[in-house]
Amino acid sequence: MSVLTKIKKKLRSGTWYPLYNTLYEKESVDSKMILLESRSGRGLESNIFALVKELNRPLYRDYTIVISYAKGFRDAVEKKLEQYGLKAGRIVQVGSLSYYRCLSRAGILINDSTFPGRFIKKDGQVYLNVWHGTPLKCMGRDNTEERYSMGNVMRNLLMSDYLLFPNAFMEEKMSGAYMLPELYQGEILHECYPRNEIFLHPEAGIRMKETLGVKEKELFVYMPTFRGKADAVDKNDSVEEIRGYLKRLDGLLKEKQILLVKLHPFVGNALSFSDYSHILPFPDKYDTYEVLNACDALITDYSSVMYDYANTGRKIILFAYDLEEYMGSRGVYEDIRTYPFPLVRTPEEVAKLLQTPSRPLEKGFLKKYCTYEHVGGTEKLCRQVVLKEEVCEVHRLSSNGKENVLLYAGNFDRNGITMAFCNLLKQIDQDKYNFFISYRGNSLKEAPWHLDVLEGDVRVYPIASEMNLDVLTAFAQAVYFKTGLRGMGIGKRLNQAYKREWKKHFGNSRFCHVIHYNGYENYMLSLIERCPFPRTVWVHNDMVRETETKKNPNRYVLRDTYGVCDHVAAVSTDITKSIVEISNREDNILVIPNCIDEEYIKNRAEQKISFDEETIANVSLEELQEILGNGDKKFISIGRFSGEKRHDRLIEAFNRYWKENTDTWLIIIGGVGNLYEETCKIASDCEAADHIILIRSMANPMPVLKKCDFFILTSDYEGLGIVLIEAAVLGVPMIATDVPGPHCLMTACGGTLVAPSADGVYEGMKAWENGKVKTISVDCEKNNRTSVELFMELLGGF
């Protein structure tokens, strides 16, 4: 393989991606270059095709048109251009070096979906998003299954200078799903969908019928929604159902009736049309909407094409044979049974309706779903965006007048930080600010259900992609992590990189305050350090000790982030010393105790004991319930399986105690952490092995805690030890090692502290046995009042 071939292979494979930062920084914006992308390059269709036709007019001869295509779609794009006599200055493959060069240069960007996660809009670029359809299915935050992955759509919409909304319904639903009124800084264009303008020219439909050779026939089209998964087409029951329905319908159509069938690309090839007399595949040679305009009726189910086709005033039949199943499995904005279209369940009913005259469409439906459709809209759209002429109806979204606060919460692992964050959300007055909860989508990909802890109508702002890391920045960051050095251009390069990252994720969105509540993650800490708004980072632990055992967070990252933040909020007085040791600054430190939801703790404790899908334990659920119900004494500890929790110390002390009291059990429940297997080994090697229960990942351990007699915290260090408060609320006596965090709480509440050693923990067990360990009392109401007051003062809004 030649050197040139190797280079070409690397460029095609995407290993050149780090060069995008160079292209972004070095390429000048060309105001005469227009990059258009349709559905991530999977063809040249819909609104983008209509815009390409308009941009081929002589009026735009000075502009270079660039069209992107996905791998495997180049021929389709080129044939489409040739078929219609259209020209493009160049076509580029999505993800290629040429693609990202054009993405960095083009003065005008037009997309009907999203650009990739690494894309950053440059100053001087104009971005028009013509989203690909009016939504019936719930989107964005309205779809709980989509909340973790909606980040790239959201940021693409927010960075757009223009959003095209062809109807009032779409504007309402898209705005709510992606929280546009509070964040969007661009303009809304109330104009027609370019693809729909063809429907306002019925004579073009007649010509298309002639072209297709069906001038004397009735032409219908069936366009159902795709069901199932893209990787399981052959096994998808709905494909078999459609095949059977089409066979029945084919036998019912008249001699001069033809049905075109356009299925989703994932299933289109799964059907053979050779056995049908009146049914043909949809002709791919022509634009979809030009063929639609030639059809006398549309048969669909839940597809947004119904809203577009309504512009023709022709018959629409909803063939929803699986209505209840579909509506039950997918969130939808409206019940299609209320629409002014006949809804049927069988092919026989479809055939009968095709023989009946159509009725005029209700004006109310057209007003709601075809609000801004009119002749000449495509031309006006191009004049507005490309030629900078003020010809479109422009609208700006109205916000609620409240300032925005961004709260980065991490990945919602089952731990004290997540619990404290959720408690804070419940306690604060969310009517005073627009609170946006942020998290990294990729970190939730394997466990999207972690977001279920977010209750109610919360605003979210997911981070869509990882860092755009180039070689020099990676080297600078490695040196910085190792030495803390910021000279020799290292600090400058990192500042440039993370400011670029902020722009990638948040664009022009404005916040009155940005809070890194999680307090971990080098990437997010570095991002917050370069945040252009007032910022606060929360501290939940002794970070000196954390950085001694963990690489993330890095000590130098904490030093510089703590040093520049407006506030560093510690959850207890005990850990402020470690903050000062890291940052050498104490004037920006606040102590804000964690909020406590007393009723929530009690209510959870009353729930049935259950394991989750991801729970791992050395006993079955039935065995656990039996043990909790016997008359033996049960000790419990709750905390992640990581080194600082010192479960080894606890097991050693318990083993010693058990040899004197064999009617005793130890239950350890932990969440994240990499020491579960090691802890199991330690437990199995001691005499009390059969009386030690280890449970990893349990969404609700409170019912177990309530049934236990004694709670033990054996950590080397903690931020606060919120589980101590949970035990106190449930009336469970406890001891804790005398370390920062628990020391402050237990001293204030008259609790029992023991030496941080196996001997100390054993002595604590004996003290409990002798009735010398009591439950502690925490004034939750007073604590929460203080916490909320301090939090609101931090924002400047108390």
Set out the residue ranges of the language-model regions:
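Conserved donor-binding/catalytic core segment of Leloir-type glycosyltransferases
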Residues: S31-E37, K215-D231, K402-G410, E613-K645, ...
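Nucleotide-activated donor-binding/catalytic signature segment of Leloir-type glycosyltransferases, i.e.
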Residues: Y84-G85, V267-D284, V458-P462, T679-S697
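A conserved mid-protein helix/loop that constitutes part of the nucleotide-sugar donor-binding site
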Residues: S46-A50, A230-K247, G416-N423, K633-R656, ...
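Short hydrophobic beta-strand element within catalytic cores of glycosyltransferases
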Residues: L298-I299, K315-Y326, L724, P733-A736
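Conserved acidic donor-binding segment of nucleotide-sugar-dependent glycosyltransferases
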Residues: P342-T346, A748-D759, K766-K772
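Carbohydrate-associated surface elements
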Residues: F169, P194, D574, C595
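Aromatic "clamp/platform" in nucleotide-sugar-dependent glycosyltransferases that forms part
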Residues: D716
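Glycosyltransferase donor-sugar binding loop
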Residues: I67-K71, I258-V267, S438-K445, I596, ...
